[in-house]
């Protein structure tokens, strides 16, 4: 009979990558803001979102939650030696500019800022108007 496997798994150790230049992808929707910091090839080094930082519901869509998410992602990336990022912003949300500013405030040098928001050429039907 085979020996039983232990129920406790060892957490995988994150090895330190030494990457000085990378990309910051900020996806800002009406409900949330997600910040991913990648190396130049696109492999994710660190990420954070408004929900991971500790906000729920409508508070996730605030600029302050986006600021905290960007600071958290920048801190993790700096542990891997990141110093300079090119920023790619996607989406119409309220946390766009705040996230870029907090990346700079966290100590990352921002090289360029590109808006990569997708534009539909008459694709999906948009959501209905709100009746408040």
UniProtKB/Swiss-Prot annotation:
Gene3D superfamilies: Ribosomal protein S11 (3.30.420.80). PROSITE patterns: RIBOSOMAL_S11. GO terms for molecular function: rRNA binding; structural constituent of ribosome. Keywords: Ribonucleoprotein, Ribosomal protein, RNA-binding, rRNA-binding. InterPro entries: Ribosomal_uS11 (IPR001971), Ribosomal_uS11_bac-type (IPR019981), Ribosomal_uS11_CS (IPR018102), Ribosomal_uS11_sf (IPR036967). One of its GO terms (cellular component) is ribosome. Residues 1-21 are annotated as: Disordered. Part of the 30S ribosomal subunit. Interacts with proteins S7 and S18. Binds to IF-3. Belongs to the universal ribosomal protein uS11 family. This is Small ribosomal subunit protein uS11. It comes from Clavibacter michiganensis subsp. michiganensis (strain NCPPB 382). The gene is rpsK.
């Amino acid at each position: 009979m085979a020996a039983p496997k232990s129920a406790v798994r060892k957490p995988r150790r994150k090895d330190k990558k030494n990457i000085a230049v990378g990309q910051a992808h900020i996806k800002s929707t009406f409900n949330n803001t997600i910040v991913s910091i990648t190396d130049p090839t696109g492999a994710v080094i660190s990420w954070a979102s408004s929900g991971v930082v500790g906000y729920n519901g409508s508070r996730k869509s605030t600029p302050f939650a986006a600021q905290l998410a960007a600071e958290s992602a920048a801190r993790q990336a700096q542990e891997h030696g990141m110093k300079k990022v090119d920023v790619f912003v996607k989406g119409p949300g309220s946390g766009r500019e705040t996230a870029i500013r907090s990346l700079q405030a966290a100590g990352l040098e921002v090289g360029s800022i590109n808006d990569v928001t997708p534009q539909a050429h008459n694709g999906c039907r948009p959501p209905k108007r709100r009746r408040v």
